[in-house]
Swiss-Prot record:
Thermal dependence, as annotated: Optimum temperature is 40 degrees Celsius.
Binding site for ATP: H145, P146, L147, C148, G149, T176, G205, D206, G207, L208, F209, N210, E211, S320
Recorded GO CC terms: membrane
Cofactor(s) in the UniProt record: Ca(2+); Mg(2+)
Variation of activity with pH: Optimum pH is 7.0 (at 40 degrees Celsius).
Protein name, entry field: Ceramide kinase
Ranges where the DAGKc domain occurs: 135-358
EC class name: transferase
Extra information: Overexpression of CERK in the Arabidopsis mutant acd5 restores wild-type phenotype.
Renumbered residue ranges of the record's region Disordered: 247-297
Gene Ontology MF term list: ATP binding; ceramide kinase activity; metal ion binding
């Protein structure tokens, strides 16, 4: 089997010599006189390749005795030698069209041999090789949203479920019955039970993924609240805040307001290094722990915490926008996402921690923690989601309708924003005094930075996933300096919207996303402050998002700050935030980015 290879018949090609290497197997025509017809057959079947990598093979199985077709040509048709009955086995792999980006396509290679034992030997050997791919999941918890998008959740799962079954991946499927179902399940799940799974999959949109994310992190992410500027006042008694938060966790009952907004709280002990790289935090590596039902050290089971080197999240897109999937895979395709999960692809993903201090100006200080994977937005972004709740019967079209209604109101909001400035960060670093008179006083940088787009095997994301110091040397574009005391910069006035993009947020309406050069795992937020401006100017700004290659952030009323943390204060009574499409009522929040806090079943976008 090794070395020179063995003669087999390949369906649609003919007799070939198959050789096994360290990373895959390859085949060549056995007879030179028929090589041209073999390869012309492969050319006519673009899904076939002459080499199969084990990293792309997700299953192999024996078939019943049946026909193995020779390559099609006129002579074979005349002679009637198209099909030959023999023992067979099939290799299930993936292929990609040569034009990129493009979806992944399942592909079958059917091999035949006269001897049944030879086929069995090949099957067992290939199984042994693909089982060495250690990153592949064995057991997954799957949440299916039956009503997301246009009701595609259940249908999409029915489409991809056979792929998981064929790959021998066990799945525990839960069809959600109500809002907060996934959150409640994961927040209440014991670590002992969670350790039975290699990951959690959302068959739905960004909202379901956000619910799963918050359910997992609410009691399993240990870190402090975001840093706040001097004068914000809520960290004067930090231990009291943390104690209040821990008490909330021990009760773990949802208030009515919290249930409406993806319920949850987070257990985070005091830590004086809130911007510490998450890769240096102490999290449990599930792959190195005992996954049996037997408890360790008496009755205690090792805690599951995040960041976590093994546990991963995944999305099979079925929502209205699917911005997270498009930003992390480049394809809004359920089959592609399913194959990425089955093959165990992995990337790290930044997560924004959002702490609501007050729900309204008259409310008492009561810190509540939420997490967002793609975007946190106020003003226009929040009002669109709130307005759309009235028109759920319209389906995905409600977002266009609500967006138009909110846009025509052209409402602005008085607010103050403070963000951490880093020395090399490209931003409009105007002071609060300079901004007091409005747009005209902003100092706009005409020479905008060179965009470095995040993609598969992104060097910036790979570099920042190791250590902060190394990332600085390896990635000059990561906009990080070794400043020990980052400076807080205030910006205040009337804003149409305030948004923080964790990732690019690509979607079908915005092909480049909100921030084209946002990275998946560089530890930064992209703070977007849209100041009050005439309605036609705002329309011009919004339409730029729909054009690939445009620069919607180049307007003078737009501030773009790349930062690790920011604080927001508003005096508006009904202030609402949009967190990955979910509502959170809050007039005072602080937000920070956690680098690579979770791992995703994805490989990055091909752009």
């Amino acid at each position: 089997m090794e070395g020179g290879g063995e003669a087999l018949f390949l369906d649609g090609v003919g007799e070939v010599t198959v050789a096994v290497g360290d990373d895959g197997l390859s085949f060549q025509p056995l007879h030179q006189e028929v090589s041209s017809s073999c390869w012309s057959s492969i050319i006519m079947q673009p899904k076939l390749e002459s080499k199969l990598k084990f990293s792309d093979v997700y299953a192999v199985e024996l078939l019943e005795v049946g026909p193995v077709c020779e390559p099609w040509n006129a002579r074979a048709t005349v002679q009637g030698k198209i099909n030959t009955e023999m023992n067979r086995f099939v290799i299930h792999t993936v292929t990609r069209p040569r034009k990129r980006p493009s979806p992944w396509v399942p592909c079958e290679y059917i091999f035949g041999h006269k001897d049944q034992q030879t086929c069995k030997t090949w099957v067992e050997h290939i199984k042994t090789c693909i089982n060495k791919e250690q990153d592949r999941p064995k057991s997954l918890m799957v949440f299916v949203h039956p009503l997301c998008g246009k009701g595609r959740g259940c249908k999409n799962w029915e489409t991809v479920a056979p792929l998981f079954e064929r790959a021998k991946v066990k799945t525990k499927v839960i069809v959600t019955q109500r809002a907060g179902h996934a959150y409640d399940t994961l927040a209440s799940l014991s670590d002992k039970d969670l350790k039975k799974f290699d990951g959690v999959i959302a068959v739905g949109g960004d909202g379901l993924f956000n619910e799963i994310l918050n359910g997992l992190l609410s009691t399993r992410h240990t870190n402090s609240y975001p840093p706040t500027p001097e004068g914000f006042g809520y960290f004067r008694n930090n231990m009291k805040c943390q104690e209040h938060r821990n008490n909330d966790l021990s009760n773990s009952e949802l208030t009515g307001d919290d249930a409406n907004a993806i319920s949850g709280s987070s257990n985070t002990p005091d830590d004086h290094e809130p911007l510490l790289s998450t890769t240096r935090s102490t999290g449990l590596d599930i792959s190195s722990s005992d996954s049996s039902d037997e408890p360790c050290n008496g009755d205690q089971v090792p805690l599951v915490s995040f960041p976590n080197n093994w546990f991963r999240l995944g999305i099979i897109p079925s929502g209205s926008t699917d911005a997270i999937v498009l930003s992390t895979t480049g394809e809004r395709d359920p089959v592609t996402s399913a194959l990425l999960i089955i093959l165990g692809r992995r990337i790290s993903l930044d997560i924004a921690q959002v702490v609501r201090w007050k729900s309204s100006p008259s409310a008492e200080v009561s810190p509540t923690v939420r997490y967002a994977a793609s975007f946190a937005g106020y003003g226009f972004y929040g009002e669109v989601i709130r307005e759309s709740e009235k028109y759920r019967w319209m389906g995905p079209a409600r977002y266009d309708f609500s967006g138009t209604m909110v846009f025509l109101k052209h409402r602005s909001y008085e607010a103050k924003v403070a963000f951490l400035e880093n020395g090399n960060t490209h931003s409009l670093t105007a002071s609060a005094e300079n901004n007091a008179n409005g747009v005209q006083t902003l100092q706009y940088h005409q020479n905008r930075h060179r965009k470095t787009i995040c993609r598969t095997n992104c060097l910036i994301c790979k570099g920042t996933s190791t250590s902060e110091q190394n990332s600085e040397d390896e990635n000059p574009d990561s906009s990080r300096t070794a400043c020990e005391t980052p400076k807080w910069v205030w910006s205040k006035g009337r804003f149409l919207s305030v948004g923080a993009a964790v990732i690019s947020c690509r979607n079908e309406r915005a092909p480049d996303g909100l921030v084209a050069d946002a990275h998946l795992s560089d530890g930064f937020l992209h703070l977007l402050l849209i100041r009050d401006c005439p309605l036609p100017f705002y329309l011009w700004h919004l339409t730029q998002f729909t054009k690939k290659g445009s620069d919607p952030l180049s307007f003078k009323f737009v501030e773009h700050h790349k930062t690790q943390a920011f604080t927001f204060i508003s005096s508006h009574d009904e202030s609402v935030w949009n967190l990955d499409g979910e509502l959170l009522q809050a007039c005072e929040v602080s937000v920070q980015a956690f680098r690579g806090l979770v791992n995703l079943f994805a490989s990055g976008p091909e752009v």
